[in-house]
Amino acid sequence: MRAQTVRSGRATLATRAEDLRELMDDPDCAPDRLRRTLERFTLVNRLIAAWGTVYRERVRPALAAAPGPARLLDIGCGGGDVLRRLVARARADGFDVSGMGIDPDDRSVAVARAANPVRGVEYRLTDSTRLADSGERFDVVVSSHVMHHLTPADLRTVLEDSGRLATRLALHSDIARSRLAYAAYAVGITPLAPGSFLRTDGLRSIRRSWTPAELAELMPDGWRVERPAPFRLIAVQDLTT
């Protein structure tokens, strides 16, 4: 699929801009800007990613069904903030849970490992296929803002890997492409953007993202697309039903 056209100096969001590249995906991008971007994702994710809702409605029930200590995996964990938050929420609810974050980018893993350590949380430089091939299994598998980075073929691979890795729940969260989401992010991210890739890459992320209808067409059997909050979508496989 070709990148979106630009009309009158403005990007159209009618179709997904799959060929559009984010600055932080460049291996030669400025390391300080990348580090600031990953570190500031902590606040960005708290503000826009609706993980509180997803935890209450999806993750917590899956953990409650686990017969003993539970394991949580974050695919493409970046700086690790979502994983740390989910583990903290689960422990506050009384669950005995450990976490693993994986990312194929050594720069992201370095930022995650440099963050405040959390007992029972580790980060590995690997991808979902290699981890699944190793025989690792987790009660809950998640990702945050990973799907829009992927081609349809790569997305299917990650979904297949997730089904192999998860024993109870696999869930991938991302932004839903829309003009309103684009406009709101363009304004709202301004205070956090200086010295980072947050503005440029965030807007490109929205242009690369799927709409719920587009994503639903790519779902294998057993998966479905849900809308947990405005501008958000999740791909879900509940393995307990």
Where are these regions (language model features)?
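N-terminal, positively charged/glycine-rich alpha-helical extensions of SAM-dependent methyltransferases
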Residues: 1-39
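Class I SAM-dependent methyltransferase Rossmann-like catalytic core
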Residues: 27, 31-56, 62
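Class I SAM-dependent methyltransferase SAM/SAH-binding core
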Residues: 73, 79-130
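A conserved beta-strand element that flanks and buttresses the S-adenosyl-L-methionine
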Residues: 142
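A short, conserved alpha-helix within the catalytic core of class I
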Residues: 150-161
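Conserved beta-strand signature within the Rossmann-like core of class I S-adenosyl-L-methionine
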Residues: 166-175
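C-terminal alpha-helical "lid/dimerization" subdomain adjacent to the S-adenosyl-L-methionine
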Residues: 175-218
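Conserved Class I S-adenosyl-L-methionine
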Residues: 208, 212-239
